[in-house]
């Protein structure tokens, strides 16, 4: 089963000592090495992961100890069979927790970027985008981008995969037409300026419900 959570950066005060105490010393050192919005986004995402694991897997020791495999994909050292994925964009962080490899991505919708599509999308996806009206193309571009990023995160082998698989968003739910099988979802997001994509490496997986956290629990 896959669980999906979202948290606004406004709910994560980086100077709040109580919130900082939820994270490991190593994680805080990394966060404090960042600057500006990157620092706040990383702090928000880290707190969201802590809260998501607390809710879904309360037996996992906290603060969470996170390592990375040979491809750089993060995992929980105390619970390697608990799969998770994080993403953040501007004002939001999202987290997926699953019993299967999972990827999640959130994108703030701005303008269509044909150079990104031409460089990173499968030729069939580029052709599909070119067939759309300008009004529909922007929405489709960010939907595809979020889904492709989520697929790459679930796989864990990096961005080199982006052109090696193809996603069909004309069907519901979206389908992987070229590449390893899995389940794709585009959950409704409360902020219309963002697109959310989820990939679970399990065929016919149940669609995850999104929980938007209004606040964080007391440590």
Residue ranges and their predicted role:
Residues 1-219:
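Core catalytic alpha/beta fold that binds nucleotide/phospho-ligands
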């Amino acid at each position: 089963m896959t669980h999906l959570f979202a948290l606004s950066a406004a709910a994560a005060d980086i100077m709040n000592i109580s919130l900082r105490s939820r994270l490991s010393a190593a994680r805080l050192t990394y966060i404090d090495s960042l600057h500006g919005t990157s620092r706040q986004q990383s702090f928000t995402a880290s707190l969201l992961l802590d809260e998501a694991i607390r809710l879904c897997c309360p037996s996992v020791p906290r603060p969470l100890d996170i390592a990375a495999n040979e491809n750089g994909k993060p995992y929980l050292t105390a619970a390697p069979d608990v799969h998770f994925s994080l993403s953040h964009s501007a004002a939001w962080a999202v987290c997926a927790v699953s019993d299967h490899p999972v990827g999640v991505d959130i994108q703030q919708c701005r303008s269509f970027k044909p150079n990104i599509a031409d460089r990173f999308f499968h030729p069939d996806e580029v052709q599909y985008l070119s067939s759309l009206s300008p009004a529909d193309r922007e929405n489709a571009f960010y939907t595809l981008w979020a889904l492709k990023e989520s697929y790459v995160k679930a796989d864990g082998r990096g961005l080199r995969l982006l052109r090696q698989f193809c996603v069909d968003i004309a069907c519901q739910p979206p389908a992987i037409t070229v590449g390893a099988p899995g389940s794709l979802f585009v959950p409704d997001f409360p902020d219309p300026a963002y697109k959310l994509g989820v990939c679970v490496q399990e065929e016919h997986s149940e669609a995850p419900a999104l929980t938007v956290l209004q606040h964080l629990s007391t440590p």
